[in-house]
């Protein structure tokens, strides 16, 4: 399910059932781009909205994402019901120009260390989530930086737009829905390019551009094979 401040009137979500695989919480920095993509993946791959909970209600700041993830996780933990406790919690954050990016990563790592179990997983994108989309069309490790009044994230979107328009005939917008099924035929290309870019960061020591989104996507594509408690 998607956690929202608004009342959910969707019948399918109200009647969704817990399935016998991991319970996972995904907290997104954006309110539209990442949740829209992940919700369309969940629906396309027929994953339960009870098992895969997605929220974009954390405000557009990496440290807020981590704080919100901890809050939701601890609310579940306080229920003292092992069957409803999240097995994994993912925090999606963009590097872009966020001043508290490193602080968010540090807080997540510290929380996990103190808990003595692997609770929070940070999924970083440099400069932004749209680089994951770019990986569906081509491999590129050319740095994506601020240009004039454009943020690095805006610059990444500008690189994505002509490729998007060639395939789909329309400009890319952050609030597009059903993105995953549109790109599904290119998913193996995206996984290959994203892995290659992340591997290259190890030798170049430059994270821009790269993303860890493929780690989350592969996990979700294989989640039905995960052994868990009922």
Predicted regions and their residues:
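N-terminal "first-domain core" detector
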Residues: 21-31
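Phosphate/oxyanion-binding active-site loops and adjacent basic polyanion-contact surfaces
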Residues: 30, 34, 58-69, 208-212
């Amino acid at each position: 399910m998607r956690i929202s401040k608004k009342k959910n009137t969707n019948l399918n979500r109200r009647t969704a059932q817990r399935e016998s695989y991991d319970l996972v919480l995904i907290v997104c920095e954006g309110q539209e781009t990442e949740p829209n993509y992940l919700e369309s993946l969940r629906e396309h791959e027929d994953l339960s909205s009870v098992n895969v909970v997605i929220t974009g209600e954390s405000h557009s700041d990496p440290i807020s994402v981590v704080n919100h993830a901890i809050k939701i996780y601890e609310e579940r933990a306080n229920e003292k019901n092992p069957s409803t406790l999240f097995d994994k919690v993912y925090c999606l954050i963009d590097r872009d120009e966020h001043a508290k990016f490193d602080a968010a990563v540090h807080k997540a790592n510290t929380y996990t260390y103190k808990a003595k179990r692997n609770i929070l997983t940070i999924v970083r994108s440099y400069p932004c989530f749209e680089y994951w989309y770019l990986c569906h069309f081509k491999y590129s490790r050319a740095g994506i930086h601020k240009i004039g009044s454009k943020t690095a994230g805006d610059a990444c979107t500008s690189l994505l737009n002509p490729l998007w328009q060639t395939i789909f005939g329309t400009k890319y917008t952050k609030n597009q829905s059903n993105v995953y099924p549109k790109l599904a035929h290119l998913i193996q290309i995206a996984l290959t390019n994203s892995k290659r870019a992340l591997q290259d960061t190890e030798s170049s020591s430059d994270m821009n551009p790269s993303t860890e989104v493929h780690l989350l996507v592969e996990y979700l594509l294989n989640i039905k094979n995960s052994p868990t408690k009922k």
